[in-house]
Amino acid sequence: MSISDHPRVYGTVALTAAFAAGILVTLGFKDCYPELENRYQRRRNRNLSRSNGDYGVVVPTANRVHRESLIFGPVRLEDHEEVTSNINSSFDWVEGIEGCIGNTPLVMIRSLSEATGCVILAKAELLNGAGGSPKDRVALNMIQDAEERGLLVPGRGDTIYEGTVGSTGISLATLARAKGYKCHICMPNDMAIEKSQLLHHLGATVERVDPAPITSPDHFVNLARRRAREHEAVHADGSVGFFADQFESTANYQAHVKTTGPEIYRQTGGQLDAFVAGAGTGGTIAGVAKYLKEEKNLWETRVVLADPQGSGLFNKIRHGVMYSSTEREGTRRRQQVDTMVEGIGINRITENFESGRVLIDDAVRVTDEQACRMARWLVEHDGIFCGSSTAVNCVAAVVTAMKLPRGSRVVTLLCDSGNRHLSKFWKHIGDMGLENDTQAQAEDLFAELGLEELKR
C-alpha cells in the first residue's frame, strides 16, 4: 500500500469506529439509565389513561415491543405507536357496573328442546351484572334518558322514585348508587320479603304498602309518583325527585329495541321462528317485537305473550278485551291479579305494552301449578334455578314450540334467579311436595305440566 493511500484507509476505519461507538454509546446510555424509561412509561400511561377515561391503567411489560442488544443485554426499545393502537384491545374490561349490562348469552335448554323436538333458547338475562334481570337494561336507559334531558344531575343529591314489585327497583337502586343518586322504592307488601331486604342493603328507602287497584292513590305506583312530587318540599338542598315511571316511560321498551332485540337477532343469525315473553310493564315483549318485525322485517316470526293466571293480557291478545266490565280494575277494591307469579301479569294496558300490542301474534295462559312444576323441572333436568316469571316463560315456550314444525327455533328469557323467590314461590313449590325425591324424578314433561294433548 502506498503512502498516499493511508489517509483514505485511516478515514474509513475512523468512520466505522465512530459509527460503532455511536451505537454503543446510545445503547449503553439506555442501559445505564433505565429509570428514565420507567418514568417516561409511567407518565405516558397516566396521560393515555386520562384521555381514554380509564384512570390508574398501567401497561404491562408483556405488552411492550422490546428488542435485545447482544452486547449490553436486554434493551427496551418501545414502539409507542404500537402500544397506543393496542391499548384497548390488550385488555378486556368494562367501565363501571353499568358495563356489565347486556350481551347476555343465549342458552339452549336441553330438556325442553328434546321434549318438543324444537330448539328452545333462553336469553340468560339473570346474568346482567347490576340487578340480575332484564330490568337492568330498562333502569340504565331510563337514567341515561333522564340525564340527557337534565332531569337527573349526578352529584346534586337527586333521588330516583319508582313503584315496582322488585326487579326494577333492585336495578335502579344498584345503578343509582353507582351514578351518585339516592333511590326510594314503593312496592306491594305481598311481594317476596327478600326483595325488600336486598333493596335495603343496596341503600334504597323502601315503602311496602297494601295491594290496591291502580285507581287508588295508595297504589304503589301512585305513591311513588306522589313521593317524587313531594321531594322538593321536604328537601331544601337543591336536589330533585325523579319519578322513573317504568310502566309508561317509553325509555323502557326503547331499551329492548336498542339492546335485547339486536342481541337476539345477532345470536340467532336472524333465524328464529318465535319469541316468547311475559309482560308486566310490557317493555320487553314490545321492544323485542318492534326490533325483529319493524326493523328486521321478520314478520314470519311469531311473538307470543306468556301470561300468568289472573292477568287480563291473555284475553286482550286473544279476544281484544281485557275482561268483562264488571271485572275492570278499580271496580272492585282489591288486588285483581291473583297469582304466585311476580313481575309479569297485569290488568291494564300500559304505554309500553300498547306500543307493541299489534305485533303480538298469540298468547299462552300459564297456571301457578304449571309454573311451579316447570321451575322444579328446570332444576332437576337443566340445573337452572329460576324465578316465577322465567317458569311462566318456559311453559309458554313449550306450548308455542308444539304448535310449530319440528326443528323450529323458539327464543324466550331467563328473567331472574330463584334466590329472590325463596319465601313465596319456592316455598309454595315445597309445600306442593315437588321437592320430594319421588316427585323430583318426573321424566314426562307434558304429563308433569298437564299438557298431554300437545304430545306429537
Curated annotation (Swiss-Prot):
Localization annotation: Mitochondrion outer membrane
Top-level enzyme category: transferase
Keyword Glycosyltransferase: no
Superkingdom field: Eukaryota
One GO MF term: cysteine synthase activity
Transmembrane annotation, as ranges: 9-29
Pfam families with a match to the protein in the record: PALP (PF00291)
Topology of the protein relative to the lipid bilayer: Single-pass membrane protein
GO biological process, one term: cysteine biosynthetic process from serine
A cellular component term, taken from the record's GO annotations: mitochondrial outer membrane
E.C. no: 2.5.1.47
SUPFAM superfamilies: Tryptophan synthase beta subunit-like PLP-dependent enzymes
Record's keyword terms, sorted: Membrane, Mitochondrion, Mitochondrion outer membrane, Transferase, Transmembrane, Transmembrane helix
Aminoacyl-tRNA synthetase as UniProt keyword: no
Catalytic function, reaction form: O-acetyl-L-serine + hydrogen sulfide = L-cysteine + acetate
Cofactor(s) listed in the protein's UniProt record: pyridoxal 5'-phosphate
Homology family: Belongs to the cysteine synthase/cystathionine beta-synthase family.
PANTHER family in alphabetical order: CYSTATHIONINE BETA-SYNTHASE
Function: Putative cysteine synthase that catalyzes the conversion of O-acetyl-L-serine (OAS) into cysteine, the last step in the cysteine biosynthesis pathway. However, in contrast to cysteine synthase cys-17, this CS-like protein may not function in cysteine biosynthesis.
Entry protein name: Cysteine synthase 2
